[in-house]
Amino acid sequence: MAPQTETKTGTGFQAGVKDYRLTYYTPDYQVKETDILAAFRMTPQPGVPAEECGAAVAAESSTGTWTTVWTDGLTQLDRYKGRCYDLEPVPGEDNQFIAYVAYPLDLFEEGSVTNLFTSIVGNVFGFKALRALRLEDLRIPVAYCKTFQGAPHGIQTERDKLNKYGRGLLGCTIKPKLGLSAKNYGRAVYECLRGGLDFTKDDENVNSQPFMRWRDRFLFVAEAIYKSQAETGEIKGHYLNATAGNVDQMLKRAQVAKELGMPIIMHDYLTAGFTANTTLATYCREEGLLLHIHRAMHAVIDRQRNHGIHFRVLAKALRLSGGDHLHSGTVVGKLEGERNVTLGFVDLMRDAYVEKDRDRGIYFSQDWASLPGVMPVASGGIHVWHMPALVEIFGDDACLQFGGGTLGHPWGNAPGASANRVALEACTQARNEGRDLAREGGDVIRAACKWSPELAAACEVWKEIKFEFDTVDTL
């Protein structure tokens, strides 16, 4: 880089450009409990040292810029700058490194995921010295966690509201996702709920289109919920998507859902944005509504292993911003998800404390303090034959959503729902009796078919359906 040149004798300021690593690469730095820590996967351009790239990431995501500026002398850079404090090569990869960066807590606004992401990933990903950059993980210190309220209610409060214990929850996304009238949509909801599901769901792109305006959908769905509750004696819900083109309209839809007595609403948190999501989570907490979160657009951000943001970071951001449910992948269905990695961020969603575990992609131990847990939602290409694996992988504190796996039943929606409910309860009972679902799951399902014709029909339809493709994003 160009040498420094002094512009005025006696000022102590030297104009020019200097290497980032002279200021922002500090391998002797001892991280503080209050630091926000980030793990970046870097791919430097040929000829650019890893130390310079790591320092550039730290600089450009905190106090630095491309040239020396005289206003650096007006602040305490050592107090406010980000620091690249460690580098490690990625095993099995040429010219890839994990850069560990520590950020002082004072760089971030309290209770603002928007500001957190604007600072850490807002600009640095376009830096020319890097061929690719991916944010693999964040350590959120307890001091910063305590500035957020997180989930409106959390897992235990949700179970208390629904009076459902000892098993996973069952859901279904109504299909076709677009094109149904509000009345036919409500009918599909009713059939699924009376058949044994706990929830039905708007798809992520169901908002307020010409074929079905939001208010009409809300009214027919409310009718379906009250009718199915009266028939079954169970509390039912439907994830009414309150996502809208502006925050005022979003809150209006949430208010109507509340006035109709609905227990839960839904939000697309990535497409709508963190500010909108935190606003809605605050409303839901105050008004007693559960909040289901869909991750539409996540794969644009997280699927490529060398560039973007890993979903575990997006999941942590959601736990801060607020949501009672979050889609997490299934491991066994049609959507991307490696088992160890998925289990890693599922624990980060649910547990109060998670230890560092690189085998599961967890770069830092994470203490969530008192932030409520978020229930993972397994959805996408799953059916009754997947139930043993889902129960074994996710346990009880999860919502298992079978869209096509309910609505595609040859006898209709209600029998499809019944088949899933029987399969879930059979697998839960078998697990509680000490049986190994990974090894005996097929036998458990086949035995349950003998006293559930609905399940037997579902098993016959989907006996050959598998989604066996290599995972793109691996450790």
Curated annotation (Swiss-Prot):
Modification sites for N6-carboxylysine: K201
Signal listed as a keyword: no
Molecular-function annotations in GO: magnesium ion binding; monooxygenase activity; ribulose-bisphosphate carboxylase activity
Record-linked Pfam families: RuBisCO_large, RuBisCO_large_N
EC number: 4.1.1.39
Cofactor(s) this protein requires: Mg(2+)
Main location: plastid
Cofactor note as given: Binds 1 Mg(2+) ion per subunit.
Methyltransferase keyword on record: no
Reactions catalysed: 2 (2R)-3-phosphoglycerate + 2 H(+) = D-ribulose 1,5-bisphosphate + CO2 + H2O; D-ribulose 1,5-bisphosphate + O2 = 2-phosphoglycolate + (2R)-3-phosphoglycerate + 2 H(+)
SUPFAM superfamilies xref list: RuBisCo, C-terminal domain, RuBisCO, large subunit, small (N-terminal) domain
Residues annotated as site: Transition state stabilizer: K334
Keywords in alphabetical order: Acetylation, Calvin cycle, Carbon dioxide fixation, Chloroplast, Lyase, Magnesium, Metal-binding, Monooxygenase, Oxidoreductase, Photorespiration, Photosynthesis, Plastid
Residues annotated as binding substrate: N123, T173, K177, R295, H327, S379
GO BP terms, alphabetized: photorespiration; reductive pentose-phosphate cycle
Modified residues (N-acetylproline): P3
Function field: RuBisCO catalyzes two reactions: the carboxylation of D-ribulose 1,5-bisphosphate, the primary event in carbon dioxide fixation, as well as the oxidative fragmentation of the pentose substrate in the photorespiration process. Both reactions occur simultaneously and in competition at the same active site.
Misc remark: The basic functional RuBisCO is composed of a large chain homodimer in a 'head-to-tail' conformation. In form I RuBisCO this homodimer is arranged in a barrel-like tetramer with the small subunits forming a tetrameric 'cap' on each end of the 'barrel'.
Protein name (record): Ribulose bisphosphate carboxylase large chain
Species in which this protein is naturally found: Ostreococcus tauri
Taxon lineage: Eukaryota, Viridiplantae, Chlorophyta, Mamiellophyceae, Mamiellales
Gene (UniProt): rbcL
